[in-house]
């Protein structure tokens, strides 16, 4: 008998991103490559993007508590991270409790803190992750082509001063989903981004909608 393991955990992506997300948003402009470098090697192997139990134990803090800022900024950071993770090439691995913003580290001696869902911010986070999962499943652009550049293109990877990245994912028929991730603590009014084709575009999902944050 033999076991064939096809996919590999992308530890480089995870380490770079965790380092970036823990940082004060002002200083992220000087470490912009932490969120872009993974695309240099994204298609060299079949990767899984892992947020595993190892990342939320042993003093590393829960995913929510890795985020800097006040209470609301932590939840906003978590939603931005999840949007980036779900639209980045690679299979996804998210450890239990991260989907509703558990504050404490995972403890195998007890169950998750389900009572947090009685609080609005945690409940809205769960609703956002649900909506994000539904969007992911309904749009093959986010998962159909994950092994070459036909499925991903940067629109702007260099806006480090505003800590913004824009890109699109494409399915086998060329249908695209455009993505904008703002890792700053600021809102950018009238932000201009490039698009691959002329036309009318609509916002399909936004982590800052009132129902989510």
Where are these regions (language model features)?
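Acidic, His- and aromatic-enriched active-site or binding-groove loops in soluble protein domains
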Residues: 7-23
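Transcription/chromatin regulatory elements, primarily intrinsically disordered
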Residues: 34-38
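Short, small-residue-biased leader/transition segments that mark boundaries at the very start
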Residues: 1-5
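Acidic (Asp/Glu)-rich catalytic clusters
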Residues: 39-44
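Carbohydrate-interacting/catalytic domains
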Residues: 26-30, 45-47, 54, 59-94, ...
